[in-house]
């Protein structure tokens, strides 16, 4: 697809995708506050509504805020302070969500690490950010203790998958999974940790939301060595605020089933902060087995879900769903990986045959932009595309290795301009400068390294 010089139209100027957005959403200022403050502002009038669900136990927004404040007080009691980085090695549990907002409240940062990593890998990530506090799941304790050797870790906070279960379920879990860990004197269990916070201040420690990194998440290293990506409060709030344009699909009172892990930007920004700031209930599935996804969908009937393409391909072939009415589904979104046109067609045919109004939603982004930069949701979609840029995001293509923008329709390197662009790579200024560049137009762009083009309607197509 090509455009002659005299007809050249540039995406960064024309922004053809804006025709799909209601004018009331365009150009609205971003919340100038922390992630915790934004969460509270959005829900302070709805405290009795459910915020989280964990194996049948429901946690209201009132309880969520109480637990966040208790966690913040406990962090202060064990010495975590403004500017510190605590490393977390865990799947998603309510405690990890409390820890995220509590760390943000006191001006600290969470370094989120995949619990499947080796001892050496976990050790390297602890050392990289010089953590003095390590938070880990009880089932990863042995490896984490080994990983913490020869680091500056002073305390280890252990979270059990049973900590937020109802009493009968907690008893059943402990009978089936007896804790055989040998805990050293520097280890504190979650309930003892919370008790230690009694009497400590729960006041917020002021930070600059444009500068304070609420998390460090790690790239996979597929295009070089793994890097710690610092994402700020403003980055997370930018993702959440931009998805308010999809309120016709996702709104207060609905359920989002969270099947993504906390150690990727997609899992926390889209799977936790976004739905909670929209007033949804987040049903937490800590270890989502794709083979069991169909039964989970039938059990919880979530209107929304963020996953990867294989999740939906699995659903489309699940015999348990063969004759089921799935009309409760509003937006099941696939990101994190590409999906072929044929596979997309199969999933959409399955959804339509089961009374789902809209096709599978899609998105494109990367860790460096806090997960998402584009979305195809509801009726706004084209086969094979990654959707249109989010309402406050600009996506265009450039001559590879340069800042020369190419016209709409021409293929080049995809670059992204958004308030969700990372603060930078942790202690890697040269790598940051190579990816995060100020162009002649004065805007800051992330160079993705991906090849693609934008069509005349503003839809982004990734790949040749």
Role assignments for model-derived ranges:
Residues 78, 105-195:
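Structural core segment of the AMP-binding/adenylate-forming
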Residues 60-62, 214-241, 376:
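Conserved AMP-binding A3 loop
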Residues 237-255, 263-306, 314, 318-319:
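Conserved AMP-binding/adenylation subdomain of ANL enzymes
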Residues 48-93, 97-101, 118-123, 127, ...:
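Conserved AMP-binding/adenylate-forming core of the ANL superfamily
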Residues 180-218, 225, 248-255:
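Conserved pre-ATP/AMP-binding loop-to-beta segment of ANL
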Residues 303-307, 316-383, 394:
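Gly/Ser/Thr-rich phosphate-binding loop
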Residues 404, 415-464:
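Conserved ATP-binding/catalytic segment of the ANL
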Residues 65-70, 210, 229-249, 259, ...:
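Conserved structural elements of the adenylate-forming
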């Amino acid at each position: 697809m090509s455009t002659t010089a005299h007809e050249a139209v540039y995406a960064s100027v024309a922004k053809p995708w804006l025709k799909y957005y209601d004018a009331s959403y365009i150009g609205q200022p971003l919340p100038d506050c922390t992630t915790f403050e934004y969460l509270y502002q959005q829900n302070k009038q709805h405290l009795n509504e459910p915020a989280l669900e964990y194996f049948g136990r429901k946690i209201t927004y009132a309880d969520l805020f109480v637990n966040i404040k208790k966690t913040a007080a406990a962090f202060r009691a064990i010495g975590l302070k403004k500017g510190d980085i605590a490393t977390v090695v865990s799947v998603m549990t309510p405690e990890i969500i409390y820890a995220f907002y509590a760390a943000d409240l006191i001006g600290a940062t969470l370094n989120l690490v995949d619990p499947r990593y080796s001892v050496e890998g976990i050790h390297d990530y602890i050392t990289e950010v010089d953590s003095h506090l390590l938070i880990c799941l009880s089932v990863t304790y042995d490896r984490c203790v080994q990983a913490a050797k020869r680091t500056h870790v002073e305390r280890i906070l252990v979270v059990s998958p049973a900590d937020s279960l109802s009493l009968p379920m907690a008893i059943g879990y402990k009978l089936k999974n007896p804790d055989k860990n040998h805990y050293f004197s520097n280890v504190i269990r979650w309930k003892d940790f919370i008790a230690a916070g009694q009497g400590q201040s729960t006041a917020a420690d002021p930070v600059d939301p444009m500068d304070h990194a609420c998390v460090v998440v790690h790239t996979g290293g597929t295009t070089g060595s793994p890097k710690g990506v610092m994402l700020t409060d403003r980055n997370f709030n930018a993702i959440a605020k931009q998805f308010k344009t999809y309120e016709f699909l996702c709104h207060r009172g609905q359920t989002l089933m969270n099947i993504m892990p906390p150690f990727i930007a997609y899992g926390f920004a889209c799977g936790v902060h976004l739905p909670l700031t929209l007033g949804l209930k987040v049903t937490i599935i800590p270890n989502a087995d794709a083979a069991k996804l169909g039964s989970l969908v039938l059990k919880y009937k979530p209107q929304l879900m963020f996953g990867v393409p294989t999740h939906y391909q699995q659903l489309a072939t699940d015999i348990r769903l063969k004759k089921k009415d799935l009309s409760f589904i509003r937006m099941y979104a696939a990101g994190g990986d590409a999906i072929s046109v044929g596979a997309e067609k199969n999933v959409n045919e399955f959804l339509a045959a089961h009374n789902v109004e809209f096709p599978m939603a899609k998105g494109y982004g990367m860790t460096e932009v806090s997960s998402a930069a584009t979305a195809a949701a509801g009726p706004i979609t084209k086969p094979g595309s990654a959707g249109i840029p989010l309402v406050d995001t600009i996506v265009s293509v450039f001559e590879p290795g340069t800042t020369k923008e190419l016209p709409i329709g021409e293929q080049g390197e995809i670059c992204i301009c958004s308030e969700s662009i990372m603060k930078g790579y942790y202690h890697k200024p040269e790598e940051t400068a190579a990816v995060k560049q100020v162009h002649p137009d004065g805007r800051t762009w992330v160079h993705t390294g991906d090849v693609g083009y934008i069509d005349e309607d503003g839809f982004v197509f990734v790949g040749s």
